[in-house]
């Protein structure tokens, strides 16, 4: 690590015009659990890192405290500068020490945080950095109720920041210190202001330069001004004529840079952003730059089977690839924000994003989501402000999630939700707030947008009952700006001989999930009452609290290898670039009944279905959904679907065959089971 820092120092000396330097702190960490009492047997790890990587459902999951140690040689030449250490994600509570001195704590596992360590450093010497990390549940650190795994660890990158005494602040809510506010956006002109946060070593003024560079590299705005430093943020107005507006179809990105210095630049920070307007109305739906965009969104959680929660760029690229193949144009960061890399890519790809704050209730009846204490409420407010400040400049982020699926019993949570909603608007007036609700009452009237979490027909009633609910919503609450989200679990290893069979806590067949999505898609797709449709979830995710250690509501398995039938349903409905033809239930190749019926998804027109040499009659059931009546088959039969150039097929064994034994995981006797 010493050699690594020293090498970067040489590069910094050569680049004398760039005073700020940023050094990765991902290498050279020693990791050991607090229960081990000493670091004698510490493991050498590289960030991102988590101590929980078992997502296979064995139930082995640690909620504990661990230590991360690193040694840094800090050159004597840096003694006239300032040093900051930044962590992009530590789950969930971090206490930071330098050379044995306490630096500070961060309570919240999804946002970045920065500490200044200048006065703790021994310049020209080795310095010991210690981060004590806990992923234990706390009643004053949100979320206090969730079924997703909180894996623990320093699960995102870390870095050392070197600046002059006066600099753009790395300390403002873990952000870059620059918020690019858009006050007025049109095809003719963008007007806004750059809000700049500064730190100073005693100077009372400095010269700031604001430059804005267009997507083609041309400078479209520049302003230089002498600024008084008084502890308040500095605001520099700007305007851009004939802007290229950011949209899903044209994700144009501008570069906004702020530099400090007169003849010599002593600090410089640049951020990317895009200029666009966002409006949502009951009649006009969700519009970007005045054009309505029906949102086809998926909920995205925070892990996979290989990396656990310590996701890296290739993990995000793979997930975005599948999301784009599905045809979704939006994603929801469930419960908490993802890494900056994901939102950078959404900016570039034109993907719309809903970012949740971690105020969430799971479906476990014993959970408490809201503790009516000052500590809890302050933590929720702090995390929300950090989320907004750190993601403010991303044009892809179009709404802030305030809460998800909270109950209205017990302490009245609505006054606190009102405070959170007001705080979001105070920090960012340009974006709407949103909530996901499965409750009645005043809780649904707090945020600008409301997304109804609906599951009628999953355990009670029938899936067609959702149309009754929809009609009641339109009759009584059409003035609300409503979206809808839905989903249900389906494990590819669980097979049912009827899609109507009710799911159980430890048995949720894929066929049931498929049926649920088919009926909801039939009844709700392209319904103008809703500004957006959100599918829960894009991928299965780790949940040690559930049977098999996995929440199986994804359209794709947690290892990303198997796409469930429902994936192809939405691909047929949403992906207009790549046609779809898919026969459902192909994993059930052994059929014991001679009477068989088939479902086919096609976006390439009505398919032809062959059973051996025989053509089966196909009828259109709903948009992109086709079905056959039950037909008599026996023996080994190849089923082939044809639609234009597309082909899909499956070979079945039909008749008196042995049913495969149902594979079950270890029986659980603890933890109440959720309702979905």
Where is each model-derived feature located?
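Active-site-adjacent substrate/metal-binding segments within catalytic domains
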Residues: 48-74, 78-87, 91-98, 104-107, ...
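Extended acidic/polar, glycine-enriched regions
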Residues: 122-124, 195-281
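Accessory carbohydrate-binding/adhesion or oligomerization-edge regions at the termini
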Residues: 19-56, 132, 138, 159-160, ...
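Aromatic-rich peripheral "rim/lid" segments of glycoside hydrolase catalytic domains that contact
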Residues: 536-603, 613, 644-646, 650-675
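Beta-strand-rich binding/interaction modules
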Residues: 189-226, 234, 595-616, 636-642
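Short strand-edge motifs at loop-to-beta-strand transitions and within beta-strands
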Residues: 68-70, 111-115, 232-238, 624-627
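Accessory beta-strand-rich segments of carbohydrate-active enzymes
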Residues: 23-25, 30-36, 58-59, 63-171, ...
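Substrate-binding/catalytic cleft of secreted carbohydrate-active enzymes
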Residues: 320-322, 330-562, 566, 570, ...
């Amino acid at each position: 690590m010493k050699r690594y820092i020293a090498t970067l120092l040489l590069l910094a000396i050569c680049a004398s015009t760039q005073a700020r330097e940023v050094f990765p702190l991902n290498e050279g960490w020693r990791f050991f659990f607090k229960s081990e009492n000493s670091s004698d047997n510490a493991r050498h790890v590289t960030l991102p890192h988590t101590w929980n990587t078992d997502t296979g459902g064995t139930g082995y999951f640690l909620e504990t405290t661990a230590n991360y140690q690193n040694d840094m040689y800090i050159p004597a030449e840096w003694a006239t500068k300032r040093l900051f250490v930044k962590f992009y994600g530590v789950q969930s509570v971090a206490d930071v020490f330098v050379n044995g001195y306490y630096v500070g704590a961060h309570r919240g596992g999804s946002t970045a945080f920065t500490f200044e360590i200048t006065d703790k450093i021994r310049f020209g010497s080795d310095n010991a950095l210690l981060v004590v990390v806990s992923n234990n549940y706390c009643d004053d650190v949100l979320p206090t109720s969730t079924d997703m795994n909180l894996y623990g660890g320093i699960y995102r990158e870390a870095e050392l920041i070197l600046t002059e005494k006066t600099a753009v602040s790395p300390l403002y809510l873990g952000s870059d210190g620059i918020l690019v506010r858009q006050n007025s956006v049109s095809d003719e002109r963008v007007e806004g202001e750059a809000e700049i946060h500064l730190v100073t070593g005693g100077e009372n003024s400095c010269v700031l330069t604001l430059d804005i560079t267009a997507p083609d590299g041309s400078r479209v705005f520049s302003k230089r001004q002498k600024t008084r430093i008084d502890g308040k943020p500095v605001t520099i107005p700007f305007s851009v004529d004939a802007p290229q507006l950011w949209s899903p179809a044209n994700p144009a990105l501008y570069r906004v840079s702020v530099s400090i210095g007169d003849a010599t630049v002593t600090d410089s920070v640049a951020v990317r952003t895009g200029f666009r307007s966002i409006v949502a109305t009951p009649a006009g739906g969700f519009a970007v730059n005045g054009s309505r965009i029906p949102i086809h969104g998926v909920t995205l959680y925070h892990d996979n089977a290989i990396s656990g929660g310590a996701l890296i760029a290739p993990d995000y690229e793979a997930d975005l690839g599948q999301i784009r193949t599905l045809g979704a144009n939006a994603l929801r960061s469930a419960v908490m924000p993802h890494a900056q890399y994901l939102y950078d890519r959404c900016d570039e790809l034109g993907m719309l994003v809903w970012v949740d704050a971690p105020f969430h209730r799971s479906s476990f009846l014993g959970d408490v989501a809201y503790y009516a204490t000052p500590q809890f409420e302050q933590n929720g407010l702090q995390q929300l402000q950090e989320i907004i400040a750190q993601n403010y400049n991303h044009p892809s982020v179009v709404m802030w999630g305030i809460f998800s699926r909270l109950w209205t019993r017990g302490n009245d949570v609505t006054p606190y939700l009102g405070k959170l909603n007001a705080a979001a608007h105070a920090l960012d007036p340009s974006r709407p707030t949103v909530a996901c609700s499965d409750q009645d009452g005043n809780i649904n009237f707090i945020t600008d947008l409301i997304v109804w979490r609906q599951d009628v027909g999953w355990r009670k009633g029938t899936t067609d009952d959702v149309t009754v609910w929809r009609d009641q919503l339109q009759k009584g609450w059409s003035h609300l700006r409503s979206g809808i989200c839905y989903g249900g679990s389906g494990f590819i290893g669980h097979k049912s001989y009827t899609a109507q069979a009710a799911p159980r806590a430890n048995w949720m067949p894929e066929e049931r999930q498929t049926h649920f999505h088919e009926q909801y898609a039939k009844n709700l797709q392209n319904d103008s009452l809703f500004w957006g449709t959100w599918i829960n979830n894009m991928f299965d995710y780790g949940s040690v609290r559930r049977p098999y250690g996995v929440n199986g509501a994804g359209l794709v398995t947690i290892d990303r290898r198997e796409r469930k039938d429902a994936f192809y349903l939405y691909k047929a409905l949403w992906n207009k670039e790549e046609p779809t033809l898919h026969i459902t239930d192909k994993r059930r190749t052994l059929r014991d009944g001679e009477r068989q019926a088939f479902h086919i998804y096609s976006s390439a027109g009505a398919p032809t279905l062959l059973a051996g040499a025989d053509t089966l009659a196909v009828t259109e059931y709903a948009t992109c959904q086709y079905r056959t009546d039950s037909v008599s088959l026996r023996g080994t039969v190849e089923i082939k679907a044809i639609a234009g150039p597309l082909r899909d097929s499956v070979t079945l064994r039909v008749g008196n065959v042995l049913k495969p034994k149902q594979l079950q995981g270890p029986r659980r006797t603890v933890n109440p089971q959720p309702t979905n």
